[in-house]
A protein has these predicted regions:
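Acidic, glycine-rich active-site loops and adjacent beta-strand->loop/helix elements
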Residues: 1, 75-81, 107-112, 136-141, ...
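Condensing-enzyme catalytic core mediating Claisen C-C bond formation in acyl metabolism
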Residues: 1-49, 146-203, 207, 300-304
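Fold-independent oxyanion-binding glycine-rich loops
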Residues: 7, 135-138, 162-164, 172-174, ...
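Structural signature of cysteine-dependent C-C bond-forming condensing enzymes
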Residues: 62-70, 96-101, 125-134, 207-210, ...
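Flexible, glycine-rich active-site loops centered on histidine and acidic residues
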Residues: 123-157
Length: 304
């Protein structure tokens, strides 16, 4: 049996009320009032993607044997080093063995976390690895008075994969890759360049995620009704609900997108939502996880 052996997360303690943003910046861009609910998580001045990843990894590995880890994969779109192995820093902070361990960075799109998880699971299934720690973290800067400022939050999550003491068995995966430019950030740039919102909602989230989930169901023979929780990131509230309707999902089975409590944490967000679902899961529950970013990865797990 291969699957998740432990999980952890880290959300910075600081919060920014979205209403405070509205009170100060709505004069410039009034549309932000439409998404002013709740608050977003904000990293402290001395935090970055690596420090948050380490915190999530510590939470994940509490009480576990770190010496048994033979792979550390770090996913992020905001890695602080361009020419230094960021995953190696996380591994060193955890005192993971230097010899016989494969560390790797996964980057360049917000589905990098799930791609790293699939790579880890395939490595374990093939017998090349025994225990792989996958961590995803993001600290995305935004321009003031933009929808991204309202939507994005900072955070990290970690999943340990292996064959022993599995708490959620891996049941399969499916991926589609689409060079869909909902946003992009060039080298050396501080902020994303975003395309028109309706394009992102309707042709991005609203089309790509349902298509990927349908492909997974067709590949595995599973049915959407089999799942107790279905997880997919989408910071557009109406589109998040619309995807569920398109899939024929009971709204009660859709995992909350956590907009009101922390915001969208980028590469970490599918894992952040998965950790929240695992906290409330019961043995036998099946959980489907999808990501989004120049395509979509879909994974399924069954809680043991």
């Amino acid at each position: 049996m291969v699957g998740i052996t432990s999980y952890g997360g880290y959300i910075p303690r600081y919060r920014l009320s979205r209403m405070l943003v509205v009170q100060n910046m709505a004069w410039y861009f009034p549309v932000i009032m439409a998404v002013a609910q709740g608050e977003k998580a904000v990293a402290n001045w001395d935090e970055d993607a690596i420090s948050m990843a380490v915190a999530a990894a510590y939470d994940c590995m509490a009480g576990k044997d770190r010496k048994a880890i033979d792979g550390v994969y770090l996913a992020s779109t905001t890695l602080p080093f361009a020419d230094r192995l960021n995953a190696g820093i996380v591994a060193t902070a955890l005192n993971v063995p230097e010899n016989g361990t494969v560390n790797a960075d996964f980057a360049a799109c917000t589905k990098a976390g799930t791609t790293a998880a699939i790579a880890a699971l395939e490595a374990i299934e093939s017998g090349q690895r025994d225990n792989v720690l996958v961590v995803a973290a993001d600290q995305r800067g935004t321009k003031m008075a933009t929808m991204y400022e309202m939507f994005f939050g900072d955070g990290a999550a970690a999943l340990s994969f292996g064959k022993d003491d599995v708490i959620a068995e891996f049941k399969g995966s499916y991926s589609i890759n689409v060079d869909f430019v909902d946003h992009y950030k060039g080298c050396g740039k501080d902020f994303d360049y975003g395309w028109e919102e309706r394009w992102v909602r309707d042709i991005g989230y609203g089309k790509v995620i349902p298509e990927a989930i349908a492909g997974f169901l067709n590949k595995t023979g599973m049915k959407i009704e089999d799942f107790s929780k279905v997880i997919y990131p989408c910071y557009f509230g109406g589109t998040h609900r619309g995807i569920a309707k398109k899939l024929g999902l009971d709204p009660a089975k859709v995992q909350d997108n956590m907009h009101a409590v922390c915001g969208d944490t980028g590469t970490a967000h599918p894992f952040v939502m998965l950790v929240a679902a695992l906290e409330e899961a019961n043995p036998g529950d099946k959980i489907l996880v999808a990501s989004f970013g120049q395509g979509c990865d879909v994974m399924a797990f069954e809680v043991t």
